[in-house]
């Protein structure tokens, strides 16, 4: 509310974000004209409207902390694991079908432990899982 009547800028913008359940967001609004003419109610409506149209036009992303993992399995196990993987929050980065099947996956922290346990169980331990770097990636396209 820097330079504005108290409660007429920051709180209305924050209310828009809260109602849309958005976090880790920054909205900057610059007003050039109309403070005295608009009055307190007009300022609240102006700032709220600005935040709303900004949110409407923004691409909303679901950023998740995740781990890049590499999986190597025999062809005999691939059908089973290809059934399991989509049940978790996973992005397939690449797949290579050579002597073995090698998959590079991004797995959310919430899914990683259970997914890896299930992959080991379903493959009877005939799987290699390599944990790589931890990342922060957009999982908006992944259905929960």
Report the location of each language-model feature.
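Portal/gating segments that form or line small-molecule/metal binding sites
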Residues: 1-22
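Helix N-cap motif at beta-to-alpha junctions
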Residues: 74-78, 108-113
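Stable alpha-helical structural segments in soluble proteins, enriched in small hydrophobic residues
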Residues: 46, 50-58
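Glycine- and acidic-rich phosphate- and metal-coordinating loops
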Residues: 23-34
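Short glycine-/aliphatic-rich beta-strand segments at the starts of folded cytosolic domains
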Residues: 59-77, 103
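Short proline/glycine- and acidic-rich turn/helix-capping motifs at secondary-structure junctions
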Residues: 97-110, 131-144
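Short amphipathic alpha-helix segments
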Residues: 71-90
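A common structural junction motif
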Residues: 88-93, 120-128
């Amino acid at each position: 509310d820097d330079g504005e009547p108290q409660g007429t800028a920051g709180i209305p913008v924050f209310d828009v974000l809260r109602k849309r359940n958005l976090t880790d967001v920054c909205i900057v609004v610059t007003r050039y004209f109309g403070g005295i003419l608009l009055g307190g109610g007009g300022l609240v409506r102006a700032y709220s409207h600005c935040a709303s149209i900004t949110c409407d036009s923004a691409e909303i992303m679901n950023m998740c902390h995740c781990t890049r993992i590499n999986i190597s399995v025999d062809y005999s196990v691939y059908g089973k694991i290809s059934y399991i993987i989509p049940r978790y929050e996973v992005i397939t980065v690449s797949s290579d079908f050579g002597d073995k099947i090698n998959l590079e996956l991004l797995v959310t922290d919430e899914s990683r432990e259970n997914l890896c346990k299930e992959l080991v169980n379903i493959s009877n331990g005939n799987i290699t899982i390599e944990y790589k770097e931890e990342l922060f990636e957009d999982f908006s396209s992944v259905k929960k």
